Regions:
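Acidic, PIN/NYN-like endoribonuclease modules and their adjacent C-terminal/linker elements
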Residues: 39-43
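ATP-dependent carbohydrate kinase catalytic cores
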Residues: 75-78, 83
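Conserved C-terminal alpha-helix-loop-beta "cap" of PLP-dependent enzymes
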Residues: 310-427
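N-terminal small-domain helix-loop-helix segment of the aminotransferase-like
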Residues: 64-72, 76
Length: 427
């Protein structure tokens, strides 16, 4: 459509880049239809949970102070528990981010002398300090919790033999990171996670299994809690917040595990009874309601990105045809210059701070300089269109988000345009 092409041209996208994108898009009709089918199922699942728990306007009332008898907060946790098919849920704006939620879950369920096992290799950068892999005050290691790790096999599969040897009487909790994080391994499917949980529990039935579910919610019709996870943990400024939640995190799981998490978050004896919602309930409810369709938009953007960059010779994880289990698309660009150009394109497509110039910086919690592009309405929201990555080989940029598919499309086209303008790509 000439009118659309002119609008893109006015925003700095050349006809060559636009036409290259349209050719890629023409191949994706069935992939997009499949994504929409999953979104439709998950949308119905969320609505059913809200109806079952009789969500009403009364749930949107603000509370302050202690937050005793907070109807909206307590009911939202019932909705989450029903959607994730768990006994209980802790969904709070007092949880500041995904790393905080994971820290609460680990600290609540591990005691001095216990052992934590990761059977999927090194955890995400920020969690390394939480555990004590990298020294930090108040880490689990400082409190006497031991850590053991089993790396993935070279083909990215689980090392079942190594895991069997690693599980011992002191193994209290097993942590499984669903998403790739800043690695280039594949993200695990719910089915794969279920098989791993079954294997671990066949060796030690009472072991607690926690899944870091960040970036994975609503990408499939099932969640890790459907296949045996004792806790699933995530951030409300990622998938389940639907782009509307301004802060927050969640922990869904068994009554025992979640109850301990509540005591860790607030205080022993207080647990889930305190924690005012501060007027955030409308955003948290509506964001969760919108989340399945927002996640679908983000996933379409990831698929589109792989189908643009892979034919140009860049390694994409997942590749252009693989099934997807989170919203992250990794593209190995081979150089710092490529990462900067890509991120400048994402930033230039943003509705907020589009004029900003992303550059690598020393971000707290990371060992390497990190570049981030995110013109977001909620600071740090990675369900909104964003791209980031550590400045280290293989110089992979991690693209995720897009509250609407059309914004995700614009961002990817703009990233390619900046690569072309920098002389890093020829179409």
């Amino acid at each position: 459509m000439e009118e659309l092409l002119n609008q893109y041209r006015a925003m700095g996208i050349s006809p060559a880049v636009y036409e290259y994108g349209e050719k890629a898009l023409a191949r994706l009709a069935e992939r997009f239809a499949q994504i929409d089918r999953v979104a439709e199922y998950n949308q119905a699942k969320v609505i059913a949970a809200m109806q079952k728990n009789r969500v009403s306007a009364a749930c949107f009332a603000a509370t302050t102070g202690y937050g005793y008898d907070d109807l909206g907060r307590d009911n939202l946790e019932k909705v989450y528990a029903d959607v994730f098919h768990t006994e209980a849920a802790l969904v709070r704006p007092q949880i500041t981010c995904g790393t905080h939620a994971l820290t609460v879950a680990l600290g609540a369920n591990l005691l001095p002398g216990d052992e934590l096992l990761s059977p999927v290799g090194m955890p995400y950068d920020t969690l390394q300090e939480v555990i004590g892999i990298r020294e930090s005050p108040c880490s689990l290691a400082e409190y006497g919790v031991k850590y053991r790790q089993v790396d993935l096999l070279p083909d990215g599969s689980f090392d079942y033999e190594g895991i069997q040897k690693a599980i011992n009487p002191k193994t209290k909790l097993i942590t499984i990171q669903r998403s790739k994080g800043y690695a280039t391994r594949p993200t695990f499917s719910v089915k794969q996670i279920g098989a791993l949980i079954d294997f671990c529990k066949s060796i030690k039935p009472d072991v607690i299994v926690m899944v870091d579910n960040c970036y994975g919610e609503f990408v499939e019709t099932m969640e890790p809690s459907d296949v045996g996870a004792d806790m699933v943990v995530g951030s409300l400024i990622k998938n389940p917040g639907g782009g509307l939640a301004p802060i927050g995190g969640y922990i869904c799981g068994t009554e025992k595990c979640v109850s301990r998490c509540a005591f860790r978050l607030s205080a022993p004896g207080l647990g889930q009874e305190v924690g005012a919602n501060l007027g955030l309930m409308p955003a948290l409810y509506q964001g969760f309601f919108l989340a399945p369709t927002v996640v679908a938009s983000a996933e379409k953007g990831a698929v589109f990105a792989a189908n643009l960059y892979e034919p140009l010779g860049f390694k994409c994880v997942p590749n252009a045809t693989e099934s997807r289990h989170d919203i992250i698309q990794a593209v190995e660009l081979g150089s710092e210059e490529g990462m900067i150009a890509f991120c400048k394109g994402i930033q230039a497509a943003a509705p907020v701070d589009s004029y900003a110039d992303p550059l690598p910086w020393d971000m707290p919690g990371y060992n390497d300089k990190v570049i981030m592009a995110a013109g977001a309405f909620v600071q740090g929201s990675s369900i909104e269109l964003s791209a980031d990555g550590p400045i280290r080989p293989p110089y992979a940029v991690y693209f995720q988000g897009g509250l609407t598919w059309y914004h995700a499309k614009l961002g990817i086209l703009m990233s390619l345009q900046k690569m072309v303008d920098a002389g890093l790509v020829q179409l």
